[in-house]
A protein has these predicted regions:
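N-terminal hydrophobic/helix-forming segments and targeting peptides
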Residues: 1-351
Length: 351
């Protein structure tokens, strides 16, 4: 979707570029379908640095494991593993949708999206009814729903013999689920091994409040910043310094892996941009990165008067009062923090 949108605005895939890039050119590169970097070439040499906006496009969710489908007491489930920091108790008894891809051994990619259309089925993670939850209610919030209890209820109707049930098949409900997946997605059970399926709350974003002053939606961390960063990039024109917007994966689990910021996707892509200008050198790449200025765009917590004890009010952000700039993050003694220097903050505020 992002690629289609930016191509309408004149962006071209960097790998398709023939000839030398010049000021005003717009290019992009995609990493494994999960991260994207966009560049608008400025009038100044790239080695003088770029203005970079960065955001992440993954959100906390529940992932389906690689051998997930099982039956227990005539109920079919998908075995799961939660992704990122979640409050597990928030994910039970909600309508849930299944998104992702199935990649078959022949390389065929089948997209999966079940639970978002009005006539789609939805899924659920079950919970105890209040009448049986006496002991459960005594537990801490962190333990009231355990990670192993987040398996997704996906079916309960058994496959009948006249519908093709094998006489030796003991798990008729599981067999029926697989029949449906085969009919709709041409999927075999072993295809789960090379699938990436994600469980998220079902439903569209909605206006919140009688005055419609707020937006209620899944995934605002950090897609609200990714969306605005993308459109800021599309709106900018005639830049002096090269502009860059990078939207990446895997932030919620530490920015690891080939599509997270710990990989060298940005550095490699900048190297390709310099090379496409016909003047590549390692020194120019290092100078381009050293002289660049970046805003890491992520969400912040707005002051909530119902939970005032969780905030330091004098330094807190307040809802609906404009942009939030964090000089530093981290915990306790600024552990794991990136502490921006005062000169850079002053430059940002002047802008």
């Amino acid at each position: 979707l992002t690629v289609k949108e930016i191509e309408k605005k004149g962006y071209r895939n960097l790998k398709d570029i023939k000839g030398s890039l010049k000021a005003g050119d717009k290019v992009y590169a995609v990493c494994m379908g999960k991260s994207i970097a966009m560049f608008q070439i400025g009038k100044e040499p790239l080695e003088k640095g770029m203005n970079i906006l960065g955001a992440h496009i993954d959100s906390p969710r529940i992932d389906v494991k690689q051998n997930p489908l099982y039956e227990n007491e005539n109920l079919a489930y998908l075995d799961t593993h939660y992704y990122g920091g979640i409050k597990k108790y928030q994910w039970v008894t909600l309508p849930l949708a299944l998104h992702g891809v199935i990649v078959k051994t022949d390389g065929t990619v089948q997209k999966v999206n079940i639970g978002e259309k009005e006539d789609d089925p939805v899924f659920v993670v079950t919970d105890l009814l209040i009448h049986l939850a006496g002991k459960q209610m005594e537990k801490k919030a962190s333990a009231v729903i355990e990670g192993e209890k987040l398996d997704l209820l996906i079916g309960s109707r058994p496959l009948e013999k006249e519908e093709g049930l094998d006489e030796d098949e003991k798990d008729a409900v599981k067999a029926n689920v697989m029949k449906i997946l085969t009919d709709y997605y041409n999927m075999e059970e072993e295809d789960f091994l090379s699938a990436e399926l994600e469980i998220v709350p079902a439903g569209k974003a909605r206006d919140c409040g009688l005055d419609r002053s707020m937006i209620l939606a899944y995934g605002q961390d950090d897609r609200v910043c990714a969306f605005t960063s993308l459109f800021a990039m599309l709106d900018v024109e005639d830049v002096e310094r090269t502009s860059c917007c990078i939207l990446v994966d895997k932030e919620e689990i530490g920015s690891v892996g080939a599509t997270g910021m710990h990989a060298h996707f940005l550095e490699n892509t900048v190297a390709e941009v310099i090379n496409s200008q016909g003047e590549y050198s390692e020194l120019k790449l290092r100078r381009a990165l050293k002289n660049s200025k970046m805003l890491s765009a992520d969400v912040n917590a707005g002051y909530d008067p119902l939970y005032a004890e969780a905030f330091e009010k004098r330094s807190a952000a307040f809802f609906g009062r404009g942009l939030v700039f964090n000089k530093f993050t981290g915990a306790r003694g600024k552990s794991g923090s990136n502490d921006a220097n005062a000169e850079y903050l002053a430059e940002v505020f002047r802008a």
